């Protein structure tokens, strides 16, 4: 199949697959300013921690391009404002701040150069983030494939594929690797309410690649696990604390609890850029709350009565004791997590 590119930057425009429109329509969303990128991240045109990080980096490039004709002092003021706007697009995914910090360091390091040279340096750094993500995902996939047995039945949650990254994917990247290495795997994909990333995105990627799979309602997962029909669970991550506590799409924690009860291996697949070395535990992770309409409506159609209140956290935190291992591009991290995570710093 044709390679899925969730992000592409060419001719000073950032092109994104509009993930709000999948699977029924394949449309490209064009970002010509950093404000467009801010909108795309907030409104989930682009989603998935690694993809958000790469998009944010190119957002800084677009900001630099926009302000090139300003006086130096104004240029740096405007860039600082743009960095702030982009950094605050969404609060939970650490890759967003990681990418913004990398771009900020480039500005600080090259502050004495001509503005056009600063722009070129920013473009080079964004390209590096983009290319690194692809390489990182392929390394993770190879390490992750080690935990996948022949004929394994895998359960996954949300979308962790090429759409959630620059390419290939994190947890879904491991699934791809196992499939292409001939392991005869089968996948159950949670639909992932309320945004339905499992049914709209993961199922779409699995169909595109010809990977044997079934889509299930989130509430079916516990029955499959109890009945011994799941060999391993693979999920992604939006932020990992020093002790291994992991913020991921809402519903991940629930899966980890059931997996622990029935002794099913539960792996997090994420690049080391998703580890937040500045927080000790998941208690410090800010959990984004999103619009009530995501729960009360599906595709614009109201499914709940007027007047009902809604609680809609986008993520939950899975405690480290429920996690079998964290698969990264540097290998598989096992408990004790803090001790082993610090070795990666």
Curated annotation (Swiss-Prot):
The record places the active site at 238
Task: Cite a single Pfam family from the UniProt record.
Answer: IF-2B
Statement: the UniProt record of this protein carries the keyword Ribonucleoprotein: no
InterPro entries assigned to the protein according to its UniProt record, in alphabetical order: IF-2B-related, IF-M1Pi, IF_2B-like_C, Initiation_fac_2B_a/b/d, M1Pi_N, NagB/RpiA_transferase-like
Its annotated pathway? Amino-acid biosynthesis; L-methionine biosynthesis via salvage pathway; L-methionine from S-methyl-5-thio-alpha-D-ribose 1-phosphate: step 1/6
* Record GO terms (molecular function): S-methyl-5-thioribose-1-phosphate isomerase activity
Q: What name goes with this protein?
A: Methylthioribose-1-phosphate isomerase
Q: Say which species the protein is native to.
A: Thermoanaerobacter pseudethanolicus (strain ATCC 33223 / 39E)
Gene of this entry: mtnA
């Amino acid at each position: 199949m044709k390679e899925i590119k969730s992000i592409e930057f060419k001719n000073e425009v950032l092109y994104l697959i509009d993930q709000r429109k999948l699977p029924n329509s394949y449309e490209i969303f064009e970002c010509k300013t950093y404000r467009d990128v801010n909108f795309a991240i907030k409104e989930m045109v682009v989603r998935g921690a690694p993809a958000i990080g790469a998009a944010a980096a190119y957002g800084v490039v677009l900001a630099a391009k926009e302000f090139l004709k300003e006086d130096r002092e104004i240029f740096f003021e405007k860039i600082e404002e743009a960095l702030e706007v982009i950094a605050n697009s969404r609060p939970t995914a650490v890759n967003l701040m990681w990418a913004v910090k990398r771009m900020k360091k480039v500005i600080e390091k090259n502050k004495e150069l001509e503005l056009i040279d600063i722009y070129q340096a920013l473009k080079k750094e964004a390209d590096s983030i983009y290319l690194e993500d692809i390489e990182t995902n392929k390394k993770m996939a190879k390490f992750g494939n080690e935990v996948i047995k022949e004929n394994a039945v895998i359960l996954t949650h949300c979308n962790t594929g090429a759409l959630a990254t620059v390419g290939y994917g994190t947890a879904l990247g491991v699934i791809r690797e196992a499939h292409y290495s001939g392991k005869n795997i089968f996948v159950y994909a949670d639909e992932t309410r309320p945004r339905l990333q499992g049914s709209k995105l993961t199922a779409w990627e699995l169909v595109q690649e010809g990977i044997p799979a079934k889509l299930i309602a989130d509430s079916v997962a516990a029955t499959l696990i109890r009945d011994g029909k799941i060999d391993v669970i693979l999920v992604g991550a939006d932020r990992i604390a020093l002790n291994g506590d992991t913020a991921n799409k809402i519903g991940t924690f629930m899966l980890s609890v059931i997996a622990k009860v029935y002794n099913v291996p539960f792996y997090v697949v994420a690049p080391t850029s998703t580890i937040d070395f500045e927080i000790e535990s998941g208690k410090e992770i800010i959990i984004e709350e999103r619009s009530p309409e995501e729960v009360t409506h599906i595709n614009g159609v109201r499914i709940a009565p007027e007047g009902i209140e809604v609680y809609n956290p986008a993520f939950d935190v899975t405690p480290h004791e429920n996690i079998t291992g964290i698969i990264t591009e540097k290998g598989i991290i096992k408990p004790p997590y803090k001790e082993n995570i610090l070795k990666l710093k």
